[in-house]
Each structure stands twice: as structure tokens, then as C-alpha cells.
Amino acid sequence: MGRLKQKGKAGAAKNYITRTAAVRKLQCSLADFRRLCILKGIFPREPNNRKKANKGSSAPTSFYYAKDIAYLAHEPVLKRLREHKAFAKKLSRALGRGEWSAAKSLEENKPIYRLDHIIKERYPTFVDALRDIDDALCMVFLFATLPSTARLPREIIDNCARLSMQWQLYVMHTNSLRKVFLSIKGVYYQAEVMDQTITWLVPYQFTQNIPTDVDVRVMLTFLELYQTLLGFVFFKLYSDANLVYPPPLDINKDDMAAGVGAFNLQSTHVQPKRNETGKTVDVDGKKVSVKDVRQTIKSIVAADEPQVDVQMGDPDEASPGEEEQFVAHASKSAPDAVPELPTLHMLSSTPSSPSSRLFAPYTFWLSRETSRSIFEFIIRSHGGRVGWPASSGTGSPFDESDESITHVIIDRPVVQKEETPAERELRSRRKYVQPQWVVDSINAGKILLEDTYAQGKLLPPHLSPFGEYEGAYDPTAATNDADMDVETDGEEGEADASGDEKESNTDAVEAALASVAMDDPASVRAAELAAEAAGLDYNIFETKVKKASKSKKPDTASKATEEAEKDMNKMMMSNKQRKLYEKMKYSQQKKAAEKEKLEQRKKQLQKAGGK
């Protein structure tokens, strides 16, 4: 006979542990426990039977896996937190006694912890980390716009701003931006990096205030993890693109509000000059130094790559590079040299979408009322050149009088004023469009007509490029055939009156048969009279009736069978699954009703516009 199981020693009571017991086992404070759970990715679990998991108690509490808590007990960060607690006591005691030298020594040796090992544990591969940076980017861009307070140090905000600009630099360099949506919350961006779709939200540049009901400590813990994660990801992305990470920052340009232009992207093949003091070796009676050997190797393997700069150059210098493409040929001086084959890093950094260089032939000028940070990033990510006035910051590659400007992004009403012939000629050579034209062109994947978005005109609706769900309402899609027939009946009736009258009558009879019930003789008789009035042959009408009855019978039978199967499946569900199923059905019906309401409103607006 087997040994009897004691109550609370097996099953759910052993697999789960309450939060109070976990804090007691780890011997840490509740704040440190929350920080550990956030950093390690441990979250509360829901046991099947809460009463059994809580050893007979029905008091509300949070449960965790016992193995997760045992995993936390060996965490190096927990050890550092305990050391920091002891350090805080020693520092407080030294300050209370006035031992300033001891307090200074303690401050210099303050225990710190690193999160590198946690990033490696949570993200074994680079693709796993890349898929999880959406929230990290949103958090970093949010904190980059917040003001510094006592709870939010200035160093954290500066680091978030630096990380956000490094990400924008990479997206602009690789032309990875795919979709943009200007919403009430902010600007939604979607980029495609190494075949992974990354979406993030950037708030508008307004003065932000931290709400009092927001727990900043929890957000700072997430931010601490995300900053370390982005550092790993950016280093890998920059290395694969043959760029130096972190990119050098020009302090003078940064102080003058140059934005992303304060950073310089440098290729890893361009090495800084330094004095070569190596040994000299005699080769065939000639003295050869280490510098000569390196130069010879570089000339054989490949030519030096020039420095890459995010700032746009002059139009005369940029146009030949856009028109001509370099084609690798075998060297005449070294016929044995083989042309370099494309590698995975080259292919991953190459734009995969034809719309990624959408604005390459154009030069834009941003008016002072447009957001420079948004449209500079959008336009440069698609190969365009952009300039701005001095009031928007320094670093503009050209001024407003430049002859190469093709589009002016302006967001102000038209003001009638006297223009000189030179100003009139300059205006005729440029397209003055509203900012929405840039975003809609990117989402459409082509250059839209500028007349619709001209200065002062009523703009078309700005639609989200992100698909919500299958079967969602699409304002750009045409209505169904019946709606189109109703709308175009008055327009096309006169033009096609002498055309295919029989075909239109046949279609009308088919529509009537589809709407009537075949088991109702009165309805069939009414359809027969309508066919006779339309001049339709009786044999053709009989054929239509048989076809309609055949098409309706299987539909009715299949619908009844489907409903019966659904009822049987619901009977086999548990109570929890049935409630979840009912919630799903309710949400689907609600979405369908909302879609039908929007379609009806669209039809009414179209009819009102037609009148």
C-alpha cells in the first residue's frame, strides 16, 4: 500500500506559492520583489483551484509558481539588492555620526548590478530580442519627452533621447520605414528590420506632465530593462550594417538643436589615422613597415569605404550617385581577384520594398509650422532630401532659395498677397502640399496627386494603414454589387437604355428570386408576374427558379448542420470555456453591427452627395 499524501504537501499547494510566502522566502522587501519579477519576466499565475493552492483558505491573494520563486533565489541581482540594503544602513550610520570620510568611501564603493545576463537568459537569439523591442521603443520615446523631476533624473532622459535618435538613424540609413499614421495619441511608425515588423508610438512634442497616480518606480524598472535590451540590439544592428556603435555625437551641434544631425554614422572600415611605429622588415632588399603591409592588403581585398553621414549633401554631389549604380567588375591589375559576393548582412540591410526610396528624386522644404523631427525622419527614411528654416534648428543642408526644392510642406491657409515675378516663377516650379500628403504617399506606396493635398484645400480622411482584423470596415473598398446597382441606376440607366435590356431584366429577376422564399407560392407567383412584365421567356424563368431553389436548399441545410454542431460543441465545453466563447461571439456581433452601421452611413453620404 502506498504512502498516504499529506494535505498541503502535493498538488496545487506545492506547485503554487503566495506572494507573501515568496517575499518571506526570498527575504527581501515587496518593492525589491516586484523589481525582480519585472526584470526576470515572472508574473502571477492563476491556479485551477485557488482554495487548494492556498491550503484551504479562500482569501484573495496572488499566486506564483514555486519553481519560479526558487529560480529567483539564485539570482545575482537579488544578492546585489541585499548588499545595497546593508550599504544604505552603513551610509546612514556614517552620516549620522559625522564620519564624512567613511561616508565618501562607502559612496565610491556602492554596490551596483548589471542586467546583461538577464538579457541573455530572456532572449537566447537575436530575433527573439528584435521581436520584443516594440514596447521598449515606445517606453524610450515616451521618457525622452518627459521633463526631469526629483523622481526622474536628467541622466535617464538624456539616455532615452540618445537611444531614440540612434534607432531613427538606423531606420533612415537602411530605409526600413514602411507605414506611418498620425493619430491623436501620437505618431505610429512601422519598420521592417531583418524580416521582423516593428511598430512603435512617438508622442507629439508638447510639454508633458507626469500624472500623480502613475507609479514611476515600476515604469523606471521596465525602462532599466529596456535600455539594456536596446543597447544589445542596436550594437548588433549597427555591426551588421558595418557601422560604428555608438555613433559619435557632436556636442556643439547637439547644443544648437541639430537633432539627429548631431550624430555621425561612421563605417567600421574607416579607421582613424594614427602613427605607425612598427618594425621594418627587409623584403627583397627593401625595407617594408607594418603600415605598408596594411595598405597593400587593403588595396588587394577591397577599396576603403567612405564615411557615411546622415546629413544630406549638395544636390550637385548627390545626383550622380542616384543616377548611376556601381557594378563590380574584375580588376585588370589583379585578374585573380574575385568580385565580392553579397552576404546575409548586406541583404538584410538592403531595402526590400520598392517604396523605401519613394522620395529619392525629390527635395523638400519644411515650413516653420510643421514638425521637423517627424517629417525629417519620414522623408529621409525614404531617400528624400529635406531642409528647414533656422527657427527649427541648425544643420539644414540648404536654404529656402535653393533651386532643387520640388515640394514645400506647408500647413497654413492661403493668404492673398502681391508677388514679384521672381516669386511667382519660383512658386510655379514647386508643389505646395500639406503634411498629410507625405504620410498618405508612404502608406499608398506611390506618389499621390499633389492637387488633392494642395495648400488650403479640404483634406481627404487620413486612414490607418494597419489592418485591424479580418472583415473590418474598409472605407476605401467599394460597396457590394447591390448597393452599386442602386447608386448607379440613375446615372447609367439613360446611357445604356438602348443596350442590353434583356440582360438587365434577367439580373432583376434573379435578384427577385434570390430574395423570395421558394416554399411560398404567392412569392413565386409575384416573381413570375414580374418576369412576364419584363418580357422574359417562361422557359428561361423556369430555369432560373430551379437554379435558385437548388442554391438555397444546400445553404439552409448546411446552416442548420453548422448550428447543430456549434450547439454540440458548446455542450462539451466547460463553464469557463463557454463564457469565453460567449464573449467572443458578442464581440464579433458588435464588430459586425458597427461595420454595417458605417456602411449605411457611407451610403447615405454618397446619396446626399449625388443629389
Swiss-Prot record:
Compartments in which it is found: Nucleus, Nucleolus; Nucleus, Nucleoplasm
GO BP, one annotated term: maturation of 5.8S rRNA from tricistronic rRNA transcript (SSU-rRNA, 5.8S rRNA, LSU-rRNA)
Entry's Gene Ontology molecular function annotations: ribonucleoprotein complex binding; RNA binding
User: Does the record carry Iron as a key word?
Assistant: no
For bias type Acidic residues, the affected ranges are: 314-325, 482-498
Q: Which PROSITE patterns match?
A: BRCT
Q: Where is the BRCT domain?
A: 354-455
User: Which residues are in coiled coils?
Assistant: 580-609
Q: Which UniProt keywords apply?
A: Coiled coil, Nucleus, Ribosome biogenesis, rRNA processing
Instruction: Write down any Gene Ontology CC term.
Output: preribosome, large subunit precursor
What segments bear the compositional bias annotation Basic and acidic residues?
552-569, 579-602
Chain intervals for the UniProt region annotation (Disordered): 310-335, 469-506, 545-611
Q: What is its main location?
A: nucleus
Q: How does it assemble?
A: Component of the NOP7 complex, composed of ERB1, NOP7 and YTM1. The complex is held together by ERB1, which interacts with NOP7 via its N-terminal domain and with YTM1 via a high-affinity interaction between the seven-bladed beta-propeller domains of the 2 proteins. The NOP7 complex associates with the 66S pre-ribosome.
Q: Which family does it belong to?
A: Belongs to the pescadillo family.
Q: What is this protein called?
A: Pescadillo homolog
Q: Which organism is it from?
A: Coprinopsis cinerea (strain Okayama-7 / 130 / ATCC MYA-4618 / FGSC 9003)
